């Protein structure tokens, strides 16, 4: 295990430079600042009391580091969420016009980028927490230089939630609408709000743990997505497919660990000794409960769906025909399998038909040429 001095040296070497925050904020504002400011102005004009209340609440609750962290304007955050939801609706409505995209190159870059970013954030938070002298749980969001380093990583983790919205865009462009579920949209929007709140009120302390664990899970998740895109078929893809539900279970375990953290802080630690915001810990606990319920439901449904597909593949009953008459499902030697009929049953029916035709031909005294013709006709059905 690293000593505090060793951790300090490594943390200082990999620290996010302050100029990254200012330069990235200036770049993003140059692209979207005008629209975001217009949204805030409309809120201020139409809802002056609510706007004033939020501004007063922020001044009273903001952590000292919050003034140094960009993209914490609540109205800009709300505008971002509305833009995200609007984009989902727009891409869903325009699917006929836009067509279907493969998005392979975009997906490779996106998943590899988030894989590397998650690795950096997970290791950075772990080492920086050690350098700051943190214990596992019950840590305060202080104002020391070591904790400013952690605050920047928490802010980077918060901003990465916006980058993850590209997951949804890629799914919609590929027309994988089944993946854009209520769970998917709920998770991507609410986690952004939760980490905006943590970055504003307490960017450090206990927030380091859930950000570190989540980033660690995302290292494997986005790495898995990247490799599956790199190998869309073959042995590697077959091996990776076996780990699909392991990723989901890993996500659920992180929710359990976060629940344990908040339970420890709120129940085990005496309230007068609690070093972090009790309100944020309560929000964390109930949010994790909601995600556990939704992810658990998702896991059960998808396991049942996969089980049905395996059963259908084994029995041959998975094939269907659509309204245009195109058949899809299991095929054997080019034979189209009808609904509810296995390949063996189909072969038996064909043999029975041939036998019946032979019997009729023998009865009527037909020749070998007609017999062969009828056999060929029966065999082609």
Residue ranges and their predicted role:
Residues 216-222:
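Acidic, glycine-rich loop-and-strand cores that form catalytic or ligand-binding grooves
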Residues 2-208, 213, 228, 232, ...:
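Membrane-helix and juxtamembrane interface regions of eukaryotic multi-pass membrane proteins
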């Amino acid at each position: 295990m690293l000593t505090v001095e060793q951790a300090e040296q490594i943390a200082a070497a990999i620290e996010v430079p302050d100029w990254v925050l200012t330069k990235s904020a200036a770049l993003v504002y140059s692209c979207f600042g005008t629209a975001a400011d217009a949204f805030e102005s409309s809120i201020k004009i139409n809802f002056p009391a609510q706007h004033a209340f939020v501004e007063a609440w922020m001044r009273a609750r903001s952590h000292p580091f919050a003034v140094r962290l960009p993209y914490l304007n609540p109205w800009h955050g709300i505008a971002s969420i509305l833009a995200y939801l609007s984009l989902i609706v727009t891409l869903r409505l325009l699917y006929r016009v836009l067509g279907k995209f493969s998005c392979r190159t975009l997906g490779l870059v996106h998943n590899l980028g988030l894989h590397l970013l998650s690795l950096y954030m997970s290791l950075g938070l772990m080492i920086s927490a050690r350098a700051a002298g943190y214990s596992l749980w019950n840590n305060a969001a202080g104002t020391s230089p070591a904790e400013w380093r952690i605050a920047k990583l928490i802010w980077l983790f918060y901003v990465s939630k916006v980058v993850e919205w590209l997951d949804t865009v890629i799914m919609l462009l590929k027309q994988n609408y089944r993946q854009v579920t209520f769970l998917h949209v709920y998770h991507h929007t609410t986690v952004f709000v939760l980490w905006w709140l943590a970055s504003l009120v307490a960017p450090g302390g206990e927030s380091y743990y859930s950000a570190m664990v989540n980033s660690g899970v995302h290292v494997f998740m986005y790495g898995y997505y990247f490799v599956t895109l790199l190998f869309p078929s073959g042995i590697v893809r077959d091996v990776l497919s076996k780990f699909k539900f392991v990723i989901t279970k890993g996500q659920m375990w992180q929710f359990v660990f976060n629940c344990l953290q908040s339970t420890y802080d709120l129940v085990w630690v005496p309230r007068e000794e609690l070093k972090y915001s009790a309100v944020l810990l309560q929000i964390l606990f109930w949010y994790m409960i909601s995600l556990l319920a939704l992810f658990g439901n998702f896991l059960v449904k998808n396991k049942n769906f996969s089980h049905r597909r395996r059963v259908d593949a084994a029995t041959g009953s998975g094939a269907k025909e659509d309204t245009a008459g195109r058949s899809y499902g299991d095929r054997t030697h080019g034979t189209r399998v009808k609904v509810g009929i296995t390949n063996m049953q189909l072969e038996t029916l064909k043999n029975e038909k041939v036998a019946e035709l032979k019997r009729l031909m023998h009865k009527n005294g037909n020749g070998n040429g007609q017999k062969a013709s009828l056999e060929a006709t029966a065999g082609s059905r």
